[in-house]
């Protein structure tokens, strides 16, 4: 996308509309040799709001300049920042952020195939990263850590140790994502300077830092995901947008800390080449502006009324939000939204930490399945059936379960012995040739001549009893026993597939454990049963 641009032109595009750049010369040197690698990270806390269009518009610039762009969903950071995201909701929040950020990018015409999306805990729990956290903690003073997080981490009277770790982890992300530059809001500046100071002490390269301005919230302060009154949510309905804008701080002639005016400057103008003030003909009629300075000048001179400014912003904003709202009308994304951000009242009568728990026994959702990692302790042929194996499988309970599987034609006893498998554990026990089977080994299969079958593979390092879940359905409580007449598994099984990347999925949502994805070795596109 940036092949026709010179290094200087790429630099201008990368740095336009930024408030500050640290390490400009490093950027210029890299651009003379190759494309720039940059990342933008977001802690998965409260719901993303309209100010997120500021970094989205810059990501569009980076791609136009030929940059390799990584978007980091910083789930661990969301927990470290005074537990703004509870541990049991982290996976759901990541999934929500991924869907809504992608919807935002699509709404402004950014191609998703040019972006790389990464979840923080995919690498931040590794041995190497953890060791670097300890190494860094032996160098960074409490003063420096507290100072670095002052404008990002929630400030409390007695700060938690987690908040002091936060800036150092963000610094390490630059190394582990293998980028040349980190992009973020100017409120991240102290974390960026901490990274520049300490990464070289670990033997790592100093990175450049790109900072966009912060958009004031509707109350005149920083727009914040965790402060409802300060921001407009991306899924707010038209009437909610109108109501919030009506309450917004916007004094006649006052251009300081004016969240509505700032939104025009930092969001609408970078995305569009013009902005239209809509007003009654008796007050001059509609007026088209092609640069922000003219809007600011007319507002300061009170030639633009706050009511007309708000009404015009409302119209432009709803055009941006409409495709995002439409995408989130799907049942799956509605369910994801309510699960990732449960209403406080919904938790009162249920089990703490289970926002998905429901009294509706007829709702067919994957959290009703009790799927676990199991380890095959012993395997032998069924005494009365040549096509069946009789296995003892440890699923993390006091005693191993007896399982009968029709796998003789597809896998040898030696291959099954001591193997980790994935089991459905809450089917009603069923006798197979006289022996009761207490679970089912889940396998991928492809029909044909010959039929191909492979047991699913848990992530490396898994242990017997590890829970397996579908992304977006982590918090539900499995049925004690699936009632055969309800055919819950049969209904869900229709949408259980192996993806093109050999990942087990339900309706394109990954089957996971706490350590990663459930996979199979070779049966791309296979069914799961």
Swiss-Prot record:
Annotated positions binding L-tyrosine: 39, 166, 170, 173, 188
Reactions this protein catalyses: tRNA(Tyr) + L-tyrosine + ATP = L-tyrosyl-tRNA(Tyr) + AMP + diphosphate + H(+)
Motif ('HIGH' region): 44-52
Coiled-coil zones: none
Enzyme class, broadest EC rank: ligase
UniProt domain comment: The nuclear localization signal, which mediates localization to the nucleus, is also important for interacting with tRNA(Tyr), suggesting that it is sterically blocked when tRNA(Tyr) is bound.
Name under which the protein is recorded: Tyrosine--tRNA ligase, cytoplasmic
Organism of provenance: Danio rerio
Top-level taxonomy: Eukaryota, Metazoa, Chordata, Craniata, Vertebrata
Gene this chain is encoded by: yars1
